């Protein structure tokens, strides 16, 4: 098929690695430390971590806030925060210590998004049109340009400024989603390594979230491997699934061995809350999603939509099918939520950013310049509002 991209080598200059790293660290650190919790979920997350850090084995196995059990997510996110509180207790206060892993996880997610787009951007089917006398970019340089775009699109999303700095389990889920997408892409050229990364991501997201979310991700990604020839590998079943299973059952087995009665009750509640959270949308929930999801995922979603139409002849190619295999199940869960919440919205951002970056080389230069100016204006206005809001709280 004839390439839809017309680019020269001079148009694909990549950003320095140190600059991307600095941008990610500054974004992750800004507003993370030296503050009180922003809202109830942030405060509750810290409270559970503090209870674990000061408590016993029972508190670590069954997340609770001073005796009130939280059964909507697994314990992994709380474990990381509590471990950080304990490790840094002599030097850093508990509130700031609990957020150290938040910053590290955020930077990890950024790295997964960058490398995912980089690997996809080097593939033959996405390369620019080859001119008769040369001048097109090398696959490596083109891949780096697309990877830079994916990372910047991710950091530009409005919703990330709110959810990306909280002490909640959603950030662990966020990095696991980014890892899962990376594992699927890595599996194309390194099947065993990619399958192991995918299995690790599925296992960790099980420990950090809910059974329904895990089931949706499993169905979406396994169905995609049946459609996309490049991702078919026996190692997904022979290596990936066993790793996922071992990690997923580790917490329930330990809990059942240590506190059988409490574990049975807690695990039943964990499953019940997971199922009841996706019982179908009342009208108010659908209206909430229609109003807030486009703003939360801006500017990734319009670029992803443009990418869908631009690559209409290659919709079974990995750079289209792999992100959509995660976006699709997550979007279904967003629609089926029983209560108004934007918790799941952040999980859409890693695959959306990867998919959206493939719209950039298909846009005309004028459109790209307009996007740059709009992004600058939006960030200025949004940053001013966030700063004023924080000043008013203080």
What is each residue range found by the language model?
Residues 1-29, 236-244:
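Start-transfer (signal-anchor) and selected internal transmembrane alpha helices
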Residues 27, 45-69, 76, 83-86:
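Extracytosolic helix-loop segments that constitute the early lumenal/periplasmic catalytic or substrate-binding loops
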Residues 45-55, 200-342, 371-394:
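Transmembrane-lumen/periplasm boundary regions of multi-pass, lipid-linked membrane glycan transferases
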Residues 79, 88-111, 116, 143-148, ...:
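Loop-to-helix entry region of an early transmembrane alpha helix in multi-pass inner-membrane enzymes
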Residues 100-138, 155-156, 179:
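Transmembrane-helix motifs of polytopic, lipid-linked glycan transferases
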Residues 159, 172-189, 351-355:
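Specific aromatic-rich, kink-prone transmembrane helix
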């Amino acid at each position: 098929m004839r390439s839809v991209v017309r680019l020269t080598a001079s148009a694909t200059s990549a950003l320095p690695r140190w600059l991307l790293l600095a941008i990610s660290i500054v974004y992750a650190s800004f507003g993370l430390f030296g503050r009180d919790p922003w809202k109830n979920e942030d405060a509750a997350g810290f409270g559970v971590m503090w209870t674990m850090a000061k408590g016993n084995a029972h508190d670590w196995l069954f997340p609770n806030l001073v005796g009130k059990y939280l059964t909507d997510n697994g314990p992994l996110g709380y474990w990381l925060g509590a471990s950080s509180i304990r490790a840094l207790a002599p030097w850093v206060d508990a509130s700031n210590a609990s957020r150290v892993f938040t910053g590290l996880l955020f930077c990890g997610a950024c790295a997964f998004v960058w490398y995912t787009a980089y690997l996809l951007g080097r593939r033959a089917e996405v390369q620019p049109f080859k001119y008769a006398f040369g001048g097109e970019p090398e696959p490596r340089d083109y891949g780096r340009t697309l990877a830079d775009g994916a990372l910047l699109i991710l950091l530009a999303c409005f919703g990330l400024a709110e959810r990306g700095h909280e002490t909640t389990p959603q950030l662990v889920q966020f990095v696991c989603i980014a890892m899962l997408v990376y594992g699927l892409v890595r599996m194309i050229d390194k099947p065993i390594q990619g399958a192991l990364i995918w299995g690790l991501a599925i296992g960790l997201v099980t420990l950090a979230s809910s059974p329904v979310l895990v089931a949706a991700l499993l169905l979406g990604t396994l169905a995609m491997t049946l459609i996309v020839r490049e991702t078919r590998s026996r190692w997904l079943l022979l290596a990936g699934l066993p790793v996922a299973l071992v990690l997923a059952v580790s917490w329930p087995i330990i809990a059942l061995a240590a506190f059988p009665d409490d574990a049975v009750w807690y695990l039943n509640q964990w499953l019940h809350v997971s199922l009841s959270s996706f019982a179908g949308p009342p009208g108010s929930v659908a209206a909430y999603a229609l109003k807030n999801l486009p703003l939360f995922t801006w500017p990734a979603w319009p670029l992803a939509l443009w990418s869908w139409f631009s690559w209409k002849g290659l919709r079974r190619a990995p750079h289209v099918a792999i992100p959509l295999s995660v976006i699709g199940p997550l979007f279904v869960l967003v629609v089926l939520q029983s209560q108004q919440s934007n918790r799941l919205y952040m999980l859409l951002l890693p695959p959306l950013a990867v998919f959206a970056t493939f719209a950039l080389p298909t846009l005309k230069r004028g459109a790209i310049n307009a996007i740059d100016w709009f992004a600058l204006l939006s960030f200025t206005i949004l940053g001013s509002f966030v700063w004023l809001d924080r000043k008013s709280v203080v």
